[in-house]
Structures are given as structure tokens and as C-alpha cells.
Amino acid sequence: MTDNKYIIQIYGNITNNTVFYNKNIYVINGEVHVLSGVSLTIQNDTIIYIKNGKFTLSSLNKSALIFDNGSSLYANTVYFIACDKLNRRSIIPDNAGVWFCGTLEAQKETIKTNYGTQPSYFYARKIYAYYLGSTDPVKQKNSNLEPSTDNDGITILGCNNDEFKIQFLHVEQSGDNAIDIVQSYVTINNIVVLNPSEDALNIVSSSLTVVNTLILDVSLTNVYDRDIFDIEVDYGSSFIKINKYCYVEIKGIFGDQTTLVSNDLPQPTEGLYLYKGVTRNGQSYIYRNAIFNEEDD
């Protein structure tokens, strides 16, 4: 037991409709998939650990909870937290995070989604994620070494608005990018990202609409190429829309090769970008067009 809760180890895929109870702490060991057609229901305030370390049987080489396309999540408030090999909470991100896979055609690393399969459905009122993902130790400023694969905290892959219904997403101290949205179009009411190892929001040929709250704190560290927004156009244009009357709090380097259209947010400069306020004068857009797909340095 820990935190007065029983430890339940999860080693294999979730193949039947399952309930996670808040009297337990569930530990994800290796690559655990919630299979297509299967629903995972999580009681309010349940804690789920993602175990750190190398797992050779995982296609990602680390632990991850992956909701396959066609699977379902039903939750109120849930906590995803990194843990060590002794099932203790860890402040070192060394895992592959949590993945939500929809039914739009998409691929990231070894994980694919397929168009035309049973729709996914992911609902949670609040998700808190701490120390998810992993960072390459050589990816430091002025390093001449080539970084190897790293892992993001939360990945949204091939999802549409009908599939992704997470209302509040809080990601703190992620190992790589905090939230990676790939070939998706989703709306999230509230987003909070605090001190990711790299970018706060990585948007790859996707659209993201933020409705009520957008708080992104990417304080300066010795890691190079670390931005508030990393907008990529590998498979088509990408943009972020911030709705009118959204509370916005941004700190960090804005991000290159992006365009900001806003009557509220000031235009980014080369240095530290700071903004705190409400978008009272209309919607704001941050985008990059595929036609301008320059190769990154």
C-alpha cells in the first residue's frame, strides 16, 4: 500500500470494459493499450502511475497508457503521475506518457490510427499529468550530439472534436513537449502547462481551439529550441484559435515561423514573451501555413 491505497499493477493490454477505483493506485508497466471497442471508466480522483525506465517489449521502449482508436475513456478528475521502480512518485520524467488515438489517419513513432474504424470517445472533466514523457539527456544547449527519440507528456493523435472531450488539461514538468497534437482537430476548454522540458504546445498539421483558459509557463532553461508554441505543417496547415473572453497567461519564447493575429496579444519579439489578460476584442489565431513549410534548422 502507498498513500493509504492499494497498488494494482497493470502489465498487459486492457481487453475488456474496466473500472479503475479511487481506493487503488494503478501502475502502468510497459506499453498498455486500451483496445478498440473497450471502455475504461475511472472514478473521481483516481491516481494512475506511469512507471519510469526502459521496457524492451514496448514499441516505444518505455511505459505508456495508450487509448487505441475505437476505445473510450469516462472520467471525472484523474491524476497521471510518473513513478519509479519501487512504485514511488518520481520527479524524473522517464516514460512515454498518455496517448489518445482517434479515427483520423495519423501516425507518430510506432503508433498509428486508422480512418473508418469505430469512433473513439474520450471524456474527462479534469486531467492532471505530472512528469510524463522523457527527455534525451544530450539535448542540451550547444550540444553537437544528435538527440535520440524522446517522448511527450500527452499525445493527441488523429482525434476530432466528436472524439476528444477532455475539458481541462493540466500538464506539469513534462519530459519533452507537454502536449503533442498530431493530425487532429480538437477543442479544449482549459489548458495549463507548467515548465515542460521543451515546448508547451506542439501542433502538427492540426487545429486546436481553446475556450476559457490558456496558461503556458515555459521558463528559460539550458535546453535549446524550447518554445511556447511549436507549430509544424508536415501534412498540412496548423493553427491555434483562442476564443474571445479566454483568460491567457503566457511566459517564454513564443516560437519561430509562426504568425499571430490578435487584437489583444502583442506581437512576439526575439526575447521573452510575457502576456497576462483576457481576449476581450475577439478571437486570436496563431498559425503556420503548409505553403511556407521551411525546413527547420
Place the predicted regions along the sequence by residue.
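Extracellular beta-rich repeat passengers
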Residues: 1-297
